[in-house]
Regions:
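Transmembrane-helix boundary motif in ABC transporter permease subunits
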Residues: 71-101
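Non-cytoplasmic
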Residues: 130, 183-233, 243
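Periplasmic/extracellular loop-to-transmembrane helix junction in inner-membrane transport proteins
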Residues: 4-7, 32-74
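Short cytoplasmic-facing helical segments at TM-TM junctions of multi-pass membrane proteins
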Residues: 141-180, 212
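Transmembrane alpha-helical segments of polytopic membrane transport and secretion proteins
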Residues: 1-20, 240-256
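Generic hydrophobic transmembrane alpha-helix motif, especially the helices
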Residues: 102-137, 144-145
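C-terminal transmembrane helix and the adjacent membrane-cytosol boundary/short C-terminal tail
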Residues: 91, 178, 182, 226-256
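Transmembrane alpha-helices
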Residues: 128-132, 165-197, 238
């Protein structure tokens, strides 16, 4: 006998039930606190979110912050991939890069942001912090992917003098694809969290960080939650776009 619901329908139902459960927990906490300015209810946050979505200035704010953070992601990804390639080829580069990567992973975002805001304009703070936080993720993933590649295939390509571009397209990149996708997905989320945190510290004009800080000091808790929802949505959309673009690039390369 065939099941009434397919596996996909059951998974969707579980997601909806999980979301409803946590919304109920949220509502219960809001009712327990009993003060909207301390802990806003889901309906209050939804009202604030709809108000923000009807404001053209909110879209400009979101695009400005997302653009700067994604620029930092791209710079960090490029630097991490290049450094990983060099580290896999030259032991000296690997040993020189190891302390840099360890520091970028261990030092708190606040410390980086406070130091950076002294040295650079607050307008570029989220870009710089996103780059610093994002590059170790891509570095580690790509380096691990290179180390896990088939050495015999690489040696055979060298023996038969396969051109570098052909080796890159047919051998190296297809193997690195899952490592890159995983790294991109993780790095985008980290870049948004760290980038917005840097904006809250540097307070560049017209950014999400500035709006969050304004909501905090004025106890506009519903707006604080609403902007947090927007940050999460921006992160999800940007990660989805990066992964789709990555898949498209690899599918095009496979046809070369």
């Amino acid at each position: 006998m065939k099941p009434i619901f397919s596996a996909e329908q059951r998974r969707a139902a579980y997601r909806i039930l999980a979301a409803l459960f946590w919304f109920a927990v949220w509502q219960a906490l809001a009712m327990a606190v009993g003060q909207e300015f301390l802990f806003a209810s889901p309906l209050k946050v939804l009202h604030s979110l709809l108000r923000l979505l009807s404001d053209p200035a909110a879209y400009l704010t979101a695009l400005l912050s997302a653009g700067r953070i994604m620029l930092g992601f791209l710079l960090g990804a490029a630097f991490g991939i290049l450094l990983a390639a060099l580290s896999s080829r030259f032991a000296l580069v690997f040993h020189l890069a190891s302390p840099l990567v360890a520091m970028a992973r261990a030092v708190p975002v606040a410390s980086f942001a406070i130091l950076a805001v002294i040295l650079v304009s607050s307008r570029f703070l989220s870009t710089l912090i996103a780059m610093v936080i994002g590059f170790p993720v891509l570095y580690a993933n790509v380096l691990e992917g290179i180390r896990q590649s088939d050495r015999k295939l690489r040696e055979m390509a060298a023996v038969f003098q396969v051109p570098f571009f052909r080796r890159l397209v047919s051998l190296h990149l297809p193997h690195l694809a899952p490592y890159l996708r995983t790294g991109f997905a993780a790095a985008v989320g980290l870049c948004f969290k760290s980038g917005v945190a840097a904006e809250v510290i540097g307070l560049p004009r017209g950014t999400i960080g500035e709006r969050l800080y304004f909501a905090k000091v004025n106890f506009f808790t519903a707006d604080l939650f609403a902007w947090t929802v927007i940050i999460v949505l921006l992160s999800i959309v940007c990660a989805w776009g990066v992964l789709k673009l990555t898949d498209l690039c690899f599918s095009r390369l496979a046809k070369i």
